[in-house]
C-alpha cells in the first residue's frame, strides 16, 4: 500500500526537479527506512542504554557523516507535512501519525540505519555498527537516483527535530554519555599510558619542540576524537586532562631551549634570551660573513670563541656591530669596540683598526690608541715649522677634522688588510690585499699606522700595497707646497688688486679731470678696452651700475694695463685732441651741468665746479705717472678733491656721500664725466651721450678691472 500511495508523493516532489523515473526505487527506500526507524524506536524504549552503547560506536566512527545522513533519512518524516504543504498530503497519506514518532528517533539514529536495506529483523541491535557505512552508500545511491530527497530530507529533519526536539536531545545525551564511558575505557586508557610515559620523558630529558609537536599531533587526534563526543555534554574524558598537562609540560620545556644547556649557563651566566635575540640581530648584520670574522685569530664558531673572555663584555661588544649603538656608552671599552659602528669615537676606531689585527678584542688596544694619538700630535708638531709660510695655521686647525674624516677611510682601507676582515666588507674586496688570510699582522700595523698618519695629515687616501711609499718626506711636502703655492698666488692677486685700483683710479682720475683720455692713441684705446671688457666680471650690483656708467661715460682707458701702456707709449696728442674736441666745449658743459643740477637739485654747482677744476688743473699727467701711489694716498687722506670722490665711487665706501658731490664733478668737466659712474649712474647716462659716442670702446673697459679688483 505504501508503494502505491507514495509514488504520487514522489511525483509531486520529483516533477519540479524532473526526476520521475526513479520514483519507485526512492519510495521503496523510504519505506524500508521508516520500518527500520520504527524498530529502532521500539528497541530504544525497551533496551535503553544497551542500544546506546552499540550505536555510540557507530556514531563515533562516522560522526562526521551524521549531517549528511540525517537529511536523507528524514525524508520520511518530512512527508508528515508539517514543514511544507506540498509534502503534507502525500506524506500524511503514506505515513500515519506513527511516522511522526519515528522521525524523532530517525533523526538521531536512522542515519546509520538508513543504508541497511536487508536484515530488518536483525537490524535492531546488530545493524548499527555495520549499517552506518552501508547506509551512507545507499543514501548516496538514493541521491544519485532521486536528487529530490535532499531537500525533502532536510525539511523532514528540521521538522522532526522541531517536533521531537526533546527526545532527540535526550538520545544524543545518552549516546554521548555512553561514548564517554567507552572512550574512557578504550582511548583514554591507551592515551593515559602513552601520556604517562610521555610525561616521564618530558620531565627526565628535555624534549625538542619537534618531538613534542609530533606527540601533540598524535594526542591532538585523540583529543579531537574525544572532543567531538565529549564537548556537547561538556564532560571531560579521562585522557583530555592528561593531554592538557602534557601541553603544560611542553610549554615548560619550550623555555629550556631558550636558556641553552646547563654548561652554557654556567660558562656564560649573562646569556640566555638576550643572547638569543642578539644572535638574530647579529646574523642579520653579518649576513654570510658569519661570526667567524669576529671572535679572533682562533676563528672558532661564535658561541665557543667567546668563552675565552667574559660573555657579558663580548655580548655588549657585539651589539655595537648593529650600527645603532654608541660604542663608548654601550661597551665601556673602546679598545674592544669593533670598528664598524660609524657612530663611536673616530680616533678610537682608527687606532684599533690600524693597530689591532682583528679590529677588536685586542687587550693592548688602549696602549696602541695612545700611541696613535701621540703620533697624530707629533705629526702636527712635526710639520708645523715647515708650514710657517701660511700652511701651519690652516693645517693645524684643519688637521683634527681631516684626521676624523680620514679615519673613516682608513677604517675601510685597513679593515681590508685585516686577516679576517669585518662584517661590512665583501670578500672580493678583502681578497688580494697584503696580509689577507694571515693569522696575525700586528708587526705590520704599527708601521701602517705611521704611514697612514702622514696621509691623514695630507688628506690623501692611504694606499695599501706598499708601506714605504708614503713616508712623511715624500708625501707631506707636496701637499704643503701645493697649498703654499696657491696661498702665494692668492697673496699676489691681493697685491695686484690693491695696487691696480690705485693706478687705474689715479690715472683715470687725472685724465678725466684734465679732460683727455691719457696718452693712449684712439686705436690703442680700442684694444685696451676690448681686453678689459673680456675680463670684466662685476662683483655686485653697485659695481655693475658703476661699470655701465663708466663704460658709457669714461673717456680714458684707465685700467692697470692701460696705465702701463700710457707710460710706455708715446704721448700722442691725437687722443687728447679727440677728447678735447668732443668733451671740452663750454656748451656741452653747461648743458650737462644744467641737466645734472635739475635732477639732483643741488645748488652752487658752478662755484664748486670752478674750485674742483682748479684742483684738477694743478695736477699734471707727468706728476700722475711718476707719483701715482703717493698722490692717491694724499688725496684720499685729505678727503678733498676729485681723488677722494673717485675713490669713494669705485671703492663703494663713500657712495652716498659722493652722490651730492657727483653733479659738480660731472659738471666740472664733461671730459671727466667718465670717472663719475656711481650714485648718479641713471642721470649720467642720458646727460653725456657725447662721452658715450666718443670712446665707448675704451671708456668702461678701463674702469672695469678697477671694480673687479677692488
Swiss-Prot record:
Induction: Levels follow a circadian cycle with higher levels during the day, in a calcium ion-dependent manner. Triggered by water stress, osmotic stress (e.g. salt and mannitol), diacylglycerol pyrophosphate (DGPP) and abscisic acid (ABA). Pretreatment with lanthanum, a calcium-channel blocker, prevents mannitol-mediated induction. Induced reversibly by low temperature; by both acute (2-24 hours at 4 degrees Celsius) and chronic (5-6 weeks at 10 degrees Celsius) cold treatments. Levels are correlated with the rate of root elongation in the cold. The modification Phosphoserine is found at residue 626. Residues 169-187 have a biased composition (Polar residues). This is Low-temperature-induced 78 kDa protein. Residues 648-696 are annotated as: 2 X 23 AA repeats. Residues 303-370 are annotated as: 2 X 14 AA repeats of P-[MV]-G-F-G-[DS]-E-S-G-A-E-L-E-K. Residues 29-41 have a biased composition (Basic residues). Residues 317-412 are annotated as: 3 X 15 AA repeats of [DN]-[FS]-P-[STV]-R-S-H-[DE]-[FL]-D-[LM]-K-[NT]-E-[ST]. Residues 638-654 have a biased composition (Gly residues). Pfam families: LTI65_LTI78_N (PF23403), LTI65_LTI78_NYQTKV (PF23402), LTI65_PGEED (PF23399). One of its GO terms (biological process) is response to salt. The cold-inducible promoter of RD29A can be used to improve chill-resistance of crops by triggering the expression of given genes in low temperature conditions (e.g. potato low temperature sweetening). InterPro entries: LTI65/LTI78_PGEED (IPR057059), LTI65_LTI78_N (IPR056605), LTI65_LTI78_NYQTKV (IPR057058), LTI78/LTI65 (IPR037491). Residues 1-198, 225-269, 305-507, 537-577, 601-710 are annotated as: Disordered. It comes from Arabidopsis thaliana (Mouse-ear cress). GO terms for cellular component: cytoplasm; cytosol; plastid. The lineage of its organism: Eukaryota, Viridiplantae, Streptophyta, Embryophyta, Tracheophyta. Disruption phenotype: Enhanced root growth, photosynthesis and water use efficiency (WUE) under salt stress. Disulfide bonds: none annotated. Residues 14-25, 49-58, 138-168, 313-331, 340-352, 367-380, 402-418, 442-466, 475-487, 564-577, 605-626, 656-670, 682-693 have a biased composition (Basic and acidic residues). It comes from the Eukaryota. It is found in: Cytoplasm. Involved in responses to abiotic stresses. Regulates probably root elongation in cold conditions. Keywords: Cytoplasm, Phosphoprotein, Repeat, Stress response.
Amino acid at each position: 500500500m505504501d508503494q502505491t500511495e507514495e509514488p504520487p508523493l514522489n511525483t509531486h516532489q520529483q516533477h519540479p526537479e524532473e526526476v520521475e523515473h526513479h520514483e519507485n526505487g526512492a519510495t521503496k527506500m523510504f519505506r524500508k527506512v521508516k520500518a527500520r526507524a520504527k524498530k529502532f524506536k521500539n528497541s530504544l524504549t525497551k533496551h535503553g542504554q544497551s542500544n546506546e552503547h552499540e550505536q555510540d560506536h557507530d556514531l563515533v566512527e562516522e560522526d562526521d557523516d551524521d549531517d549528511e545522513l540525517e537529511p536523507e533519512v528524514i525524508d520520511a518524516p518530512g512527508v508528515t507535512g508539517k514543514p511544507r504543504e506540498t509534502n503534507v498530503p502525500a506524506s500524511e497519506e503514506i505515513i500515519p501519525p506513527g511516522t511522526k514518532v519515528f522521525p524523532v528517533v530517525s533523526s538521531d539514529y536512522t542515519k546509520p540505519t538508513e543504508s541497511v536495506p536487508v536484515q530488518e529483523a536483525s537490524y535492531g541491535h546488530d545493524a548499527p555498527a555495520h549499517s552506518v557505512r552501508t547506509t551512507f552508500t545507499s543514501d548516496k545511491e538514493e541521491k544519485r537516483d532521486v536528487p529530490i530527497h535532499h531537500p525533502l530530507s532536510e525539511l523532514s529533519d528540521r521538522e522532526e527535530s522541531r517536533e521531537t526536539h526533546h527526545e532527540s536531545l535526550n538520545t544524543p545525551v545518552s549516546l554521548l554519555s555512553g561514548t564517554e564511558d567507552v572512550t574512557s575505557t578504550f582511548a583514554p586508557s591507551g592515551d593515559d599510558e602513552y601520556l604517562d610515559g610521555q610525561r616521564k620523558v618530558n620531565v627526565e630529558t628535555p624534549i625538542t619542540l619537534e618531538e613534542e609537536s609530533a606527540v601533540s599531533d598524535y594526542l591532538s587526534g585523540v583529543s579531537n576524537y574525544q572532543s567531538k563526543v565529549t564537548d556537547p555534554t561538556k564532560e571531560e574524558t579521562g585522557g583530555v586532562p592528561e593531554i592538557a598537562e602534557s601541553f603544560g609540560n611542553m610549554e615548560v620545556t619550550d623555555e629550556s631551549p631558550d636558556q641553552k644547556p646547563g654548561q652554557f649557563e654556567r660558562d656564560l651566566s649573562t646569556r640566555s634570551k638576550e643572547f638569543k635575540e642578539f644572535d638574530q640581530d647579529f646574523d642579520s648584520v653579518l649576513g654570510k660573513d658569519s661570526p667567524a670574522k669576529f671572535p679572533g685569530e682562533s676563528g672558532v664558531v661564535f658561541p665557543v670563541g667567546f668563552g675565552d673572555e667574559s660573555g657579558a663584555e663580548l655580548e655588549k661588544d657585539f651589539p655595537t656591530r648593529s650600527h645603532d649603538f654608541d660604542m663608548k656608552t654601550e661597551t665601556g671599552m673602546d679598545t674592544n669596540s669593533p670598528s664598524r659602528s660609524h657612530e663611536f669615537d673616530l680616533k678610537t676606531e682608527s687606532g684599533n683598526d690600524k693597530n689591532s689585527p682583528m679590529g677588536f678584542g685586542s687587550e693592548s688596544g688602549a696602549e696602541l690608541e695612545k700611541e696613535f694619538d701621540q703620533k697624530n700630535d707629533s705629526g702636527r708638531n712635526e710639520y708645523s715649522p715647515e708650514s710657517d709660510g701660511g700652511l701651519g695655521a690652516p693645517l693645524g686647525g684643519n688637521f683634527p677634522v681631516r684626521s676624523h674624516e680620514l679615519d673613516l677611510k682608513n677604517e675601510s682601507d685597513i679593515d681590508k688588510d685585516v686577516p679576517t676582515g669585518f662584517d661590512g666588507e665583501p670578500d672580493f674586496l678583502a681578497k688580494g690585499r697584503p696580509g689577507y688570510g694571515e693569522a696575525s699582522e700586528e708587526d705590520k700595523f704599527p708601521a701602517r699606522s705611521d704611514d697612514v698618519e702622514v696621509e691623514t695629515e695630507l688628506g690623501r687616501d692611504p694606499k695599501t700595497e706598499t708601506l714605504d711609499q708614503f713616508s712623511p718626506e715624500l708625501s707631506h711636502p707636496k701637499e704643503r707646497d701645493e697649498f703654499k703655492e696657491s696661498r702665494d698666488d692668492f697673496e699676489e692677486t691681493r697685491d695686484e688688486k690693491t695696487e691696480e685700483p690705485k693706478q687705474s683710479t689715479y690715472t683715470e682720475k687725472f685724465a678725466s679731470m684734465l679732460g683727455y683720455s691719457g696718452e693712449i692713441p684712439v686705436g690703442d684705446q680700442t684694444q685696451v678696452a676690448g681686453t678689459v671688457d673680456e675680463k670684466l666680471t662685476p662683483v655686485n650690483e653697485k659695481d655693475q651700475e658703476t661699470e655701465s656708467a663708466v663704460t658709457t661715460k669714461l673717456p680714458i682707458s684707465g685700467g692697470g694695463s692701460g696705465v702701463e701702456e700710457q707710460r710706455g707709449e708715446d704721448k700722442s696728442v691725437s687722443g687728447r685732441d679727440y677728447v678735447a674736441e668732443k668733451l671740452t666745449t663750454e656748451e656741452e658743459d653747461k648743458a650737462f651741468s644744467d641737466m645734472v643740477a635739475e635732477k639732483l637739485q643741488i645748488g652752487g654747482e658752478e662755484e664748486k665746479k670752478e674750485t674742483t677744476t682748479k684742483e684738477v688743473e694743478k695736477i699734471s699727467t707727468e706728476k700722475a705717472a711718476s707719483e701715482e701711489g703717493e698722490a692717491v694716498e694724499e688725496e684720499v687722506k685729505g678727503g678733498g678733491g676729485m681723488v677722494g670722490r673717485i675713490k669713494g665711487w669705485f671703492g663703494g665706501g663713500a657712495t652716498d656721500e659722493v652722490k651730492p658731490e657727483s653733479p659738480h664733478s660731472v659738471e666740472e668737466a664733461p671730459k671727466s664725466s667718465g670717472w663719475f659712474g656711481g650714485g648718479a649712474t641713471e642721470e649720467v647716462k642720458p646727460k653725456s651721450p657725447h662721452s658715450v659716442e666718443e670712446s665707448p670702446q675704451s671708456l668702461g673697459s678701463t674702469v672695469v678691472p678697477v671694480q673687479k679688483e677692488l
